């Protein structure tokens, strides 16, 4: 009997020991599988180090989705695109003293093209399904495709927008009958610039030839590039600009005429400056520059007055398509461990969810990147309190509905071509303007002589 009881006791003890061992093993397993949060670094351009809409969203992510997923985003640098371009290349090339490349950084494709080895970047195709990518504006994705790999992912885009000092334009309109609708085509805008020059000159009858330029364009290169392409002809042949087409001539003639007659601002600097001083009243600039358009004009004699700035889609040629340059950097993902890359991709997905993306872009003056997010803009506009921003986002909606976004070609010589074009065209037209003011030649001769001089200078 005792033997039986002892056997039962031994069995019970054995079971208890086994259960205890298994429980301990299970506890150890849990401890081993629990991971520390993955901390990812990012360099970006949206705001300042201490005052940034993206930093605020990153804090939100870290406290919600990131907390749930065990992901923490840490901001390493907030600067401008040029600085980040330089720092990324130093890090990528492992220059002495360079910082470590962050997990995520904001970049233009030109930065990737300038890398010695772009294989250090992850392909977003590995983390976004084709079904997920269908939600994005195709042209925005296309700009970030390099050699078949999606290396620069769109999170916020800008485009070119026409900004108008409506306050002064209304005075001009009241005196001349000019209409805001005349700003819809390049032909009408250039004609109107001649009228504006004469009108502004007449405001000070005691001072001769002090008319003002109506238009300032931040990107003369883009005007020609998009203009020629909108007329159905290639602007580039390989990496060379094609000048000897009728379409280039069509884009050149009204532009050069207006510039030589004084209707286009040709000085250096950004378009915001002549609008701030009243030297011009219409500008074509990046939509992101809305941050720098002031609601007050300060004239050269120190007089100032409040003004209303409105935004409109850029003009087009009457017989051309509605084409507009897309702008704005994207976000690059540095290769590391699969877990880190996947965590970074989750943050990018979160930031580009329609509601979140609209929240982000409307705080920085950019466009959203998906079709669904664009559909949310009308409601978002109603929540904006700044009339200038309301006007900008309505212009975004009109642009997205009516225009095709143009993606500049990805080639090593693109930036050099752009810089040389901008410098030479301002220089040649400024020279022609002086000759015109000195009555050295008639306008027709100057338009086409200057074309020849300019095209020769680009060889």
Predicted regions and their residues:
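Short, well-ordered beta-strand elements
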Residues: 36-48, 70-77, 103-104, 215
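Extracytoplasmic "Venus flytrap"/periplasmic binding protein-like
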Residues: 66-139, 171-175, 281-282, 300-303
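Hinge/lid segment of periplasmic solute-binding proteins
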Residues: 105-161, 190-192, 205-209, 304-315, ...
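Short, solvent-exposed loop/beta-turn-alpha elements that line the ligand-binding surface or hinge
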Residues: 125-136, 178-182, 207-208, 213-215, ...
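Extracytoplasmic/periplasmic solute-binding protein
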Residues: 147-155, 160, 187-241, 280
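Glycine-centered hinge/linker elements that transmit conformational signals in sensory
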Residues: 190-197, 237-269, 309-310, 314
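Extracytoplasmic/periplasmic substrate-recognition and gating elements
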Residues: 256-263, 300-372
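Conserved C-terminal helix/tail region of periplasmic/extracytoplasmic solute-binding proteins
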Residues: 384, 397-459
């Amino acid at each position: 009997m005792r033997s039986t009881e002892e056997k039962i006791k031994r069995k019970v003890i054995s079971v208890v020991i086994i259960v205890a061992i298994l429980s301990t093993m299970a506890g150890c397993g849990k401890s081993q599988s629990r991971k520390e949060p993955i901390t990812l670094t990012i360099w970006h351009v949206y705001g300042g180090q201490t005052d940034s809409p993206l930093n605020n969203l990153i804090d939100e992510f870290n406290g919600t989705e990131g907390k749930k997923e065990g992901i923490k985003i840490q901001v390493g640098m907030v600067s401008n695109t040029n600085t980040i371009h330089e720092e990324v290349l130093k890090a990528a090339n492992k220059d002495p003293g360079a910082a470590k490349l962050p997990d995520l950084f904001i970049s233009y494709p030109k930065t990737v093209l300038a890398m010695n080895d772009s294989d250090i970047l992850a392909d977003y195709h590995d983390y976004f399904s084709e079904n997920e990518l269908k939600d994005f504006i195709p042209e925005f994705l296309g700009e970030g495709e390099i050699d078949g790999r999606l290396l620069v992912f769109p999170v916020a885009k800008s485009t070119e927008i026409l900004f108008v000092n409506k306050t002064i334009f209304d005075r001009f309109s009241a005196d001349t009958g000019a209409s805001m609708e005349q700003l819809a085509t390049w032909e009408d805008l250039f004609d109107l610039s001649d009228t504006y020059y004469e009108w502004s000159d007449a405001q000070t009858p005691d001072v001769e030839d002090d008319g003002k330029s109506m238009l300032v364009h931040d990107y003369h290169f883009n005007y020609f590039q998009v203009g020629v392409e909108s007329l159905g002809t290639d602007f580039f042949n390989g990496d060379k600009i094609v000048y000897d087409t009728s379409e280039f001539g069509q884009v050149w003639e009204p532009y050069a005429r207006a510039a030589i007659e004084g209707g286009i601002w040709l000085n250096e600097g950004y378009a915001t400056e002549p609008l701030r001083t009243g030297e011009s009243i219409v500008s074509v600039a990046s939509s992101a520059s809305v941050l720098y358009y002031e609601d007050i004009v300060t004239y050269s004699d120190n007089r100032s007055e409040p003004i209303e700035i409105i935004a409109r889609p850029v003009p087009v040629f009457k017989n051309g398509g509605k084409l507009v340059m897309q702008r704005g950097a994207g976000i690059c993902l540095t290769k590391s461990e699969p877990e880190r890359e996947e965590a970074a991709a989750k943050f990018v997905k979160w930031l580009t969810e329609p509601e979140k993306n609209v929240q982000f872009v409307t705080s920085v003056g950019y466009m959203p990147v998906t079709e669904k997010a664009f559909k949310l803009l009308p409601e978002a506009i109603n929540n904006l309190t700044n009339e200038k921003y309301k006007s900008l986002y309505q212009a975004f909606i009109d642009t997205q509905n009516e225009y095709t976004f143009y993606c500049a070609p990805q080639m090593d010589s693109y930036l050099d071509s752009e810089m040389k074009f901008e410098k030479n065209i301002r220089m040649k037209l400024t020279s022609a303007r002086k000759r015109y003011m000195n009555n050295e030649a008639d306008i027709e001769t100057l338009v086409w002589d200057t074309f020849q001089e300019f095209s020769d200078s680009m060889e």
